[in-house]
Amino acid sequence: MNKKYLLTFLLTAYCATFLRFYFKNNFVISIIGSFLYGFFISRKISKSKKEILFSGFFACFTSFSGFVHFLYQFIIQGYYLKLFIYLNVIVILNLIIMYIGFQLSRKIT
């Protein structure tokens, strides 16, 4: 792994982490991340840029641990119905948003 690649990867991850703290709402972060993921996955991008974008940026921005922590709060508070509804809504909605991003990107190119 060369230094330029590593530096770019770390900088991208840092920027995503910074943006993560700017948006406090996990739902909004999830929707934005899914749309952008779908948008960029259909683009013709080099393998190294995809690795940087998907593993560096999206992994830090959408942070699965933040999502799980949010769901865990429902469990602690005993809101099992909210947990079930939120989990299903967020998964289905994110798949739809990702698909929209993918289709939009294909129409642009």
Curated annotation (Swiss-Prot):
It is found in: Cell inner membrane. Disulfide bonds: none annotated. Keywords: Cell inner membrane, Cell membrane, Ion channel, Ion transport, Membrane, Transmembrane, Transmembrane helix, Transport. GO terms for cellular component: plasma membrane. It holds the Pfam family CRCB. GO terms for biological process: monoatomic ion transmembrane transport. It is a multi-pass membrane protein. The chain crosses the membrane at residues 21-41, 52-72, 83-103. The keyword Transferase does not apply. InterPro entries: FluC. It catalyses: fluoride(in) = fluoride(out). Belongs to the fluoride channel Fluc/FEX (TC 1.A.43) family. Fluoride-specific ion channel. Important for reducing fluoride concentration in the cell, thus reducing its toxicity. This is Fluoride-specific ion channel FluC 1. It comes from Prochlorococcus marinus subsp. pastoris (strain CCMP1986 / NIES-2087 / MED4). The gene is fluC1.
